[in-house]
Regions:
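Active-site loop/oxyanion-hole signature of alpha/beta-hydrolase fold enzymes
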Residues: 23-26, 31, 69-115, 125-126, ...
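Conserved HGGG/HGGXW glycine-rich cap/lid loop of the alpha/beta-hydrolase fold
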Residues: 26-77
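Short glycine-enriched nucleophile-adjacent loop
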Residues: 117-128, 133
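Flexible "cap/lid" loop of the alpha/beta hydrolase fold
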Residues: 132-168
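Conserved alpha/beta-hydrolase catalytic His-Asp/Glu region
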Residues: 168-233
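Short beta-strand/loop motif that positions the catalytic acidic residue
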Residues: 235, 241-243
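Acidic catalytic loop of the alpha/beta-hydrolase fold
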Residues: 246-250
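Catalytic histidine-centered segment of alpha/beta-hydrolase-like enzymes
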Residues: 273-283
Length: 299
């Protein structure tokens, strides 16, 4: 059953144009929102097992910015990379080439959510030119350490089992309805039953839109093999960190510690939300983005 987005009406105010470009062997699909002649362009990178729909609630609240939102290679409608692993280095190299393929008149602001925060940080630390960087729910510390280390290891075993089993059984395991629902319940913090129902529907609709088992397992291995703290000291552009006080993936202490590693960063902690800021607090995130960029406006 399709549950209507609580942000659908706002999104109609910034209709999307779909495009396609070949990058490192991936036929990468992307969506553009806002005026093409805007002063500021923002390229947004979604999280693990997500695709471009995930960040649309934030985009729906923004006006006056050109926003380019691709599906990561191997997820959504984008085909996998060719000749590159789906690890942080591979995705960072793809992001550099994707930005170049957009033929922009000026460097784009780069935004990443969750797993996307690692990809973006790696790319910018490696030389991707951007005037500013925004990380939403940044992965601030190693996933195999801290309070969720055991769960991360168990999840890794789950993904590797999904790859090792016969294809039909493995695909069924990796896309299992109960597993997706458990993940969604674990991440959602909102007490609003309507919003929670929509969040769960989003995960069931989009969380299993990946190309093949190798891609999804490589992606998870990448998500736990690196974190933003590994790249922070090499990033000297102004950086906005949008964190959350109930994020089950990254503790408040880890978020505070991450801020100190950047030469020029500000940390804004949203209250009453966890790892799904883009679903549960999109207006607040959009307001922080507009203020940080000193451009655009809220819908």
């Amino acid at each position: 059953m399709i549950v209507e987005s609580p942000y659908a009406a706002l999104l109609t105010g910034t209709p999307a144009t779909k495009g396609s470009v070949d990058v490192l062997g991936s036929t990468t699909k992307f969506w553009e929102y806002g005026p093409v002649d805007a002063t500021t362009t923002v390229i947004v990178v979604h999280g693990y097992r997500g695709e471009h729909h995930g960040l649309e609630p934030v985009i729906a609240h923004l006006r006056g910015l050109r926003i380019i939102s691709p599906d990561l290679p191997g997820f959504g409608e984008s085909t996998p990379l060719v000749g590159h692993r789906h690890d942080i280095s591979g995705y960072a190299a793809w992001l550099v080439e994707f930005e170049r393929a957009m033929h922009l008149d000026h460097p784009a602001v780069i935004l990443g959510h969750s797993f996307g925060s690692i990809v973006v940080s790696s790319a910018v630390a490696g030389g991707l030119v951007t005037p500013k960087m925004i990380l939403v729910n940044p992965i601030a510390a190693p996933a195999l350490q801290g309070p969720n280390g055991v769960m991360s290891r168990l999840t890794l075993l789950y993904y590797r089992a999904g790859r090792a089993l016969p294809e039909r059984i493995g695909k069924s395991l990796l896309s299992n309805w109960l597993v997706v629902r458990f993940m969604s319940v674990f991440l959602a913090q909102s007490k609003d039953p309507t919003l929670r129902r929509w969040i769960h529907a989003q995960h069931h609709r989009y969380f299993s839109r990946y190309a093949n088992r190798d891609t999804v397992v490589e992606g998870f291995e990448a998500s736990i093999s690196a974190d933003v703290s590994m790249f922070a000291s090499k990033i000297d552009v102004p950086t906005l960190l949008i964190g959350a006080d109930h994020d089950p993936i990254t503790t408040g202490a880890a978020q505070q510690s991450l801020k100190t590693l950047f030469p020029d960063a500000q940390l804004e902690i949203l209250v009453g939300v966890g790892h799904l800021v883009h679903y549960e607090k999109p207006l607040e995130a959009a307001a922080l983005i507009v203020d940080f960029l000193a451009d655009g406006s809220l819908a």
